[in-house]
Amino acid sequence: MNIGRAIKVTQAVVDIKFEGELPKIFNALKSKLKYKDKELVLEVSQHIGDNIVRCIAMDSTDGMSRGDEFVDTGAPISVPIGRSTLGRIFNVVGELIDECGPLKGKYNLEPIHRAPPSFTEQRIQEEVLVTGIKVIDLLAPYLKGGKIGLFGGAGVGKTVLIMELINNIAKAHKGFSVFAGVGERTREGNDLYHEMITSNVININEHEKSQAVLVYGQMNEPPGARARVALTALTMAEYFRDRENQDVLFFVDNIFRFTQAGSEISALLGRIPSAVGYQPTLATDMGAMQERIASTTSGSITSVQAIYVPADDLTDPAPATTFSHLDATTVLSRQIAEMGIYPAVDPLDSTSQSLSAEIIGEEHYKVASEVKRILQTYKSLQDIIAILGMDELSDEDKIIVDRARKIQKFLSQPFHVAEIFTGMPGKFVSLSDTVSSFKGIVEGKYDHLPEAAFYMVGNIDEAIKKAELIQAEAK
């Protein structure tokens, strides 16, 4: 047994001195004493000479003192994998935190640090993943096995959108979902758990019938837990992809907190910061995780990642580094949220590699392109409208502005997960309905309907009914 002693404790970073063999980088060390009735797990991060290793703590170091003994486990942090993990909530080191008793059934322990799949193992799918959300399905469609980023500042609706995607995709999707709560609010994690129980995605009486695993390292946790919890969840998702040959959904809320935790640790480890105070290894840390989220010949992982944008600045190094790894980006805009249009997705800033006629079909591509053209023209006319008013526009431009405003309103949609706040029943709109509805708007079939009829409805039939109600009330 290789035992070391703590010689220095600095918040989440602990220096341990070993007399014998030094533990390898990423090895887990476990405390012989218990702090707050729990073993403390450390992860080796640096060898700093004189038989001393510098480690990151996965839990609070409160109550620790110099001289406390730690045992080298001889392996990285290892977490349970297998079907028995379904329906349960884990923390970063694979301990259950849902108070539903011990893990039942067979499971193996797997290290959280692994190499990504090789080039020969990877494959690309060109099948669109229908979300039931109009603005996404029409203008920035998602691919099965793709990486999707939801970008937005504070309070523009990232978590609500990710919860609606879980609701729409995980319910319709018969495979398994893994959710990683990285440095977000505990209340939201609790809400999501109960929402999953209500919708039968999680069965608390018979866990083996559940379809989801939850892994939480919330914002009150030390940076070590927040920096590693995404890897813990990813390890569990990889099991379903590689051993069960499943198409897995992997949700992360919020990937920025992963970067932020890395930045906190980097400063405590004494590294010189790079741009805007981020860790010098930002691109490497992000790449090591993102490269593991891949589709292989065994199965696929479709990931949806919420990405907080500090001060609404998309050029900040944290969101900018994430951009390069994604297949589709859904950008949430404060200006659109202020107009009362939810989801507050920016139709011109959001992008998708799958927006091509070969993947989505000729009709869908033409409609999406025309919608973007109308919105872009309206955007360029806004200065003229603000200074001179609508009367100074040509007749053709007036028609474009009218259609653009209807499109803007029609891109809003009531969500199932927001029913309790809005009082409106949620709507799931099929892809064919979305394309045909917008095709009618851009062709001018609905120019006679009032603008208000397009706000917060599902398909175009609902807009027509709403227009009839508005006209009846006007009489």
UniProtKB/Swiss-Prot annotation:
Pfam families per record: ATP-synt_ab, ATP-synt_ab_N, ATP-synt_VA_C
Cellular component aspect of the GO annotation: plasma membrane; proton-transporting ATP synthase complex
Entry's localization field: Cell inner membrane
UniProtKB keywords: ATP synthesis, ATP-binding, Cell inner membrane, Cell membrane, CF(1), Hydrogen ion transport, Ion transport, Membrane, Nucleotide-binding, Translocase, Transport
Top EC group: translocase
MF GO annotations: ATP binding; ATP hydrolysis activity; proton-transporting ATP synthase activity, rotational mechanism
Membrane association type: Peripheral membrane protein
Catalytic activity: ATP + H2O + 4 H(+)(in) = ADP + phosphate + 5 H(+)(out)
EC code(s) of this entry: 7.1.2.2
Xref: InterPro entries: AAA+_ATPase, ATP-synt_VA_C, ATP_synth_F1_bsu, ATPase_a/bsu_AS, ATPase_alpha/beta_chains, ATPase_F1/V1/A1_a/bsu_N, ATPase_F1/V1/A1_a/bsu_N_sf, ATPase_F1/V1/A1_a/bsu_nucl-bd
Family: Belongs to the ATPase alpha/beta chains family.
Assembly and interaction partners: F-type ATPases have 2 components, CF(1) - the catalytic core - and CF(0) - the membrane proton channel. CF(1) has five subunits: alpha(3), beta(3), gamma(1), delta(1), epsilon(1). CF(0) has three main subunits: a(1), b(2) and c(9-12). The alpha and beta chains form an alternating ring which encloses part of the gamma chain. CF(1) is attached to CF(0) by a central stalk formed by the gamma and epsilon chains, while a peripheral stalk is formed by the delta and b chains.
Name assigned to this protein: ATP synthase subunit beta
